[in-house]
Amino acid sequence: MGKLQSKHAAAARKRRESPEGDSFVASAYASGRKGAEEAERRARDKQELPNGDPKEGPFREDQCPLQVALPAEKAEGREHPGQLLSADDGERAANREGPRGPGGQRLNIDALQCDVSVEEDDRQEWTFTLYDFDNCGKVTREDMSSLMHTIYEVVDASVNHSSGSSKTLRVKLTVSPEPSSKRKEGPPAGQDREPTRCRMEGELAEEPRVADRRLSAHVRRPSTDPQPCSERGPYCVDENTERRNHYLDLAGIENYTSRFGPGSPPVQAKQEPQGRASHLQARSRSQEPDTHAVHHRRSQVLVEHVVPASEPAARALDTQPRPKGPEKQFLKSPKGSGKPPGVPASSKSGKAFSYYLPAVLPPQAPQDGHHLPQPPPPPYGHKRYRQKGREGHSPLKAPHAQPATVEHEVVRDLPPTPAGEGYAVPVIQRHEHHHHHEHHHHHHHHHFHPS
């Protein structure tokens, strides 16, 4: 998980495999150890003087800690201006100071080892990146344990392979809003961590700021501020779900979340107002002053005014007039209690409507003049109104006998098709309605024509 890359300014890079298998560790101790050994060898060469043992005479009194002043040009780019030089710089400064000593002063190797601290010029840069492969937006305990194990191995290798045995390391870990963090080396032992800030970002644009003795690390980690992290995860899921539902709705595909989501009304509440709105619309259209072709007009209304399932039908129910008299019971009968909730309309329900629509309103069938072979005679209208007055209450007998069996047939044969596929229903209904309408028309025409 944690991918580690490290750079070294003064030493060559050496590959080292960690348990993660994909980490690089620089050999930070190579140049320091080589410089120290070379400085010791040159110091021994300088101690070989022709006048004998270097530990007699003025050299015993002149043993003192050798302090090397830091030149101005060497202090550039250093983090601490008062720090001591590395082994090579200390050797060059000692060579400059050596001849100035009283009576040809020689260097002591003990003073060089003890009083002049040989520091490595280990410019190290470590970058730890925690990837989010599953796009969950959260860092698990296993991810953090793997990352900290990798960091521990890298820091342990850097400390144990150093030339100085008493070298300690202070780790300062900060996760800043920018995708870059800093690790500093300092005196106290152990790990001193500042409070980290959580930054859950999708992109990882790494711009580590490189400095001397500073390890740059980028770790995505929730520790002290988990609230933005916990809010980020569900927000991503909701956003993706909304986008998916939006495109599915545009394509006309029925999906589970759009039908039963928190923002959608129940299916039964949507479909029952749909049927009632279409019937009420047919009722209002049939009450227009032009009383011809009521059956044909009703079938056209059922075709043209199909209310979509996603649109609430409350406005249609409020604006349409309430049905009165015998047709009120008829209009309520198609959506009877036998219909299962959530089952959308289909072609079988359209057939059921077409079967007993003409049976309920037989006197209105002769009003359609579009399919007559010849126009009806004038007395036909008077008998039509008398027949309508006589048979005004008779159609109620047929719906009481028929709707029970018809609705059971609808419940039994109704396939569970989505509401989006039910737009072919009114076409079949219109065709069969015309068929039965013509049958009734011819029957009534031959019945009334001799008179």
From Swiss-Prot:
Family: Belongs to the NKD family.
Quaternary structure (record): Interacts with DVL1, DVL2, DVL3 and PPP2R3A. Interacts with RNF25 and TGFA (via cytoplasmic domain).
Keyword terms: Calcium, Cell membrane, Cytoplasm, Cytoplasmic vesicle, Exocytosis, Lipoprotein, Membrane, Metal-binding, Myristate, Transport, Ubl conjugation, Wnt signaling pathway
Domain of life: Eukaryota
Expressed in which tissues: Expressed in kidney, lung, pancreas and spleen.
GO biological process, one term: protein localization to plasma membrane
Biased composition (Basic and acidic residues): 34-63, 89-99, 180-215
Residue segments, region Interaction with DVL1, DVL2 and DVL3: 113-178
GO cellular component term of the entry, any: basolateral plasma membrane
Subcellular location: Cell membrane; Cytoplasm; Cytoplasmic vesicle
Region (Interaction with TGFA): 300-385
Domain notes: The N-terminal domain comprising the first 217 amino acid residues is mostly unstructured.
Primary site of residence: membrane
Species in which this protein is naturally found: Homo sapiens (Human)
Single GO molecular function: growth factor binding
EF-hand domain residues: 119-154
UniProt lineage: Eukaryota, Metazoa, Chordata, Craniata, Vertebrata
Protein name as annotated: Protein naked cuticle homolog 2
Residues holding Ca(2+): D132, D134, K138, D143
